[in-house]
């Protein structure tokens, strides 16, 4: 059995010898080979640390590594944060802002016209309606991204599916949840007519993107769908639902008729100019748009011209119907917005229609869209 015992370690043997007063035993076996001069000099410069010191160094290293791991972000929290960011980008925030501002402005207008009927119950119902509209918006823009992955890798690589931040399976789950949640809210809180309008909007958003229809391939059909959903259905539907919640039958007011016509034409401009930043990818995948057919410059001038005509018409309406509109708001606001689009078009021309300049021009059009709804309750 003695032959199976391990020989004592040098440090342990030395320690035992020092306590007993006897010299340390010499280990059996051949003597170690002589060290080379290079190793000898290295050993002289860097003497070995004692065994206890080495053991404590290993413990310190483990402790430091453990502290460094604890200081880093937890994997679950980082995953949830990334998922939240991807879902937010998946919703296309600029479209949500337009939907939210439009619905809030129209509800505010209906309440301004009937202040005696305001009660707190309407606030909750309006909130449900806003959530349903955002869900519908999320479904439409989400289904479009699912079927535009290859094109978005060229035109919009920052979108979550194209960037690989969101899987197609997760995207499908989100759009189904959006559609189901929005439909459930509308069915349980609003009447059959509003439910029918909501389903019509979802249907138009579906045939806009989904094969075999995919009407976005045809410029005229795409323009009509966008103008109908964002222009007519949103404004008419929200105003109708608000009056119904107030216990009133539907009746057009001059300001609501104005904003419906104005925004419908504005949505047509958005539909025309939305393809300007996407010309590169559309040409690569042979998607026919007005921008690929007529050129970026011509479409930019067409969109700006339609907006200027829209603003001129708004100013004319203020003069022709002073009893229905506040001229002191309508005239200066729309004149300033018209000057803004003229200036932005000039900036685009000076920039020689670079991709960054085109994107800035398109964002400015959306800002004008938001501005119209912000000022609408005041007109």
From Swiss-Prot:
Subcellular location per the Swiss-Prot or TrEMBL entry: Plastid, Chloroplast thylakoid membrane
Membrane topology annotation: Multi-pass membrane protein
Membrane-spanning intervals of the chain: 121-141, 174-194, 195-215, 220-240, 252-272, 299-319, 328-348, 361-378
Enzyme Commission number: 2.5.1.115
Short name of one Pfam family: UbiA
Keywords, sorted A to Z: Chloroplast, Membrane, Plastid, Thylakoid, Transferase, Transit peptide, Transmembrane, Transmembrane helix
Reaction(s) catalysed (UniProt annotation): phytyl diphosphate + homogentisate + H(+) = 2-methyl-6-phytyl-1,4-benzene-1,4-diol + CO2 + diphosphate
Main location: plastid
Transit peptide: 1-65
Gene Ontology CC annotations of this record: chloroplast thylakoid membrane
Domain of life, source organism: Eukaryota
GO function terms (MF aspect): homogentisate phytyltransferase activity
Primary enzyme class: transferase
Record-level GO BP terms: vitamin E biosynthetic process
Region named Disordered: 1-39
Pathway: Cofactor biosynthesis; tocopherol biosynthesis
InterPro entries given in the database record: AtHST-like, UbiA_prenyltransferase, UbiA_sf
PANTHER family for the chain: HOMOGENTISATE SOLANESYLTRANSFERASE, CHLOROPLASTIC
Family according to the record: Belongs to the UbiA prenyltransferase family.
Free-text function comment from the UniProt entry: Involved in the synthesis of tocopherol (vitamin E). Catalyzes the condensation of homogentisate and phytyl diphosphate to form dimethylphytylhydrquinone.
Protein name: Probable homogentisate phytyltransferase 2, chloroplastic
Organism: Oryza sativa subsp. japonica (Rice)
Gene: HPT2
């Amino acid at each position: 059995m003695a032959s199976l015992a391990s020989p004592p370690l040098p440090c342990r043997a030395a320690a035992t010898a020092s306590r007993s007063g006897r010299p340390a035993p010499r280990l059996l076996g051949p003597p170690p080979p002589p060290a080379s001069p290079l190793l000898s000099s290295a050993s002289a410069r860097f003497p070995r640390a004692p065994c206890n010191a080495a053991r404590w160094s290993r413990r310190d290293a483990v402790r430091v590594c453990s502290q460094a791991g604890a200081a880093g972000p937890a994997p679950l929290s980082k995953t949830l944060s990334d998922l939240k960011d991807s879902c937010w980008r998946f919703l296309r925030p600029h479209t949500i802002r337009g939907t939210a501002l439009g619905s809030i402005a129209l509800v505010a207008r209906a309440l301004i016209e009937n202040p005696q009927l305001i009660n707190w119950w309407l606030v909750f119902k309006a909130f449900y309606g806003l959530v349903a509209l955002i869900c519908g918006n999320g479904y439409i823009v989400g289904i479009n991204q699912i079927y535009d992955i290859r094109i978005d890798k060229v035109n919009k690589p920052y979108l979550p599916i194209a960037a690989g931040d969101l899987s197609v399976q997760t995207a499908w789950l989100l759009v189904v949840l959006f559609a189901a949640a929005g439909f459930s809210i509308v069915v349980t809180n609003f009447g059959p007519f509003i439910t029918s309008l909501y389903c019509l909007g979802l249907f138009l958003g579906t045939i806009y993107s989904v094969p075999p229809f995919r009407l976005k391939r045809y410029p005229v059909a795409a323009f009509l769908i966008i103008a109908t959903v964002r222009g007519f259905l949103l404004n008419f539907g929200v105003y109708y639902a608000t009056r119904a919640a107030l216990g009133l039958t539907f009746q057009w007011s001059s300001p609501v008729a104005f904003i419906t016509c104005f925004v419908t034409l504005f949505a047509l401009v958005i539909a025309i100019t939305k393809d300007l930043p996407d010309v590169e990818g559309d040409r690569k995948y042979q998607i026919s748009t007005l921008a690929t057919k007529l050129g970026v410059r011509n479409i930019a001038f067409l969109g700006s011209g339609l907006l200027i005509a829209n603003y001129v018409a708004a100013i004319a309406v203020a003069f022709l119907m002073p009893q229905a509109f506040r001229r002191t708001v309508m005239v200066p606001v729309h004149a300033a917005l018209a000057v803004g689009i003229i200036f932005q078009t000039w900036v685009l021309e000076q920039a020689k229609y670079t991709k960054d300049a085109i994107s800035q021009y398109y964002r400015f059009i959306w800002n004008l869209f938001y501005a119209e709804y912000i000022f609408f309750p005041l007109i």
